[in-house]
């Protein structure tokens, strides 16, 4: 443990067996348990960072937004690695980078469709990119790649 950090991966239920909001609820419950039992886990509660890649990045952001809305606690920071933030697939990078790469537009959309089921893609927890309530979140670090269909961000 050279960094002095403890890494805890929260497991969450997956689609298609478990649809929206199962994964969101699991992520929120998981971080609440970690925060509540931080001392027992050898974790400094003031340094808890939420991080995730792809769907995990999505869950990290929405979990922080839920914690903020509930007025409980906020993580020290968020690290979102090529996060899935737009279930509407309306950004240009979905079209320009959505074919001929490992992760295609259709692959991303089928994942959203399985998870969201009857929930609209415009739901604030399904497409957090379009939300307006980011004020008050901790610092957010977003990592993405040039040819990633998830690259574009709202300006």
Cite the ranges covered by each PLM segment.
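Alpha/beta-hydrolase superfamily serine-hydrolase fold, recognizing
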Residues: 1-153
């Amino acid at each position: 443990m050279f960094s002095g950090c403890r890494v805890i991966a929260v497991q969450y239920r997956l689609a298609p067996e478990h649809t929206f909001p199962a994964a969101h609820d699991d992520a929120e419950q998981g971080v609440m348990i970690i925060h509540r039992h931080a001392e027992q886990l050898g974790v400094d509660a003031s340094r808890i960072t939420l991080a995730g890649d792809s769907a995990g990045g999505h869950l990290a952001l929405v979990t922080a937004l839920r914690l903020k809305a509930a007025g409980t606690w906020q993580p020290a920071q968020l690290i979102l690695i090529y996060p899935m933030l737009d279930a509407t697939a309306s950004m240009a990078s979905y079209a320009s980078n959505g074919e001929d790469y490992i992760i295609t537009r259709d692959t991303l959309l089928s994942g959203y469709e399985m998870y969201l089921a009857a929930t609209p893609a415009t739901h604030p927890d399904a497409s957090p990119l379009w939300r307006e309530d980011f004020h008050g979140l901790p610092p957010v670090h977003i990592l993405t790649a040039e040819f990633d269909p998830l690259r574009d961000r709202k300006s």
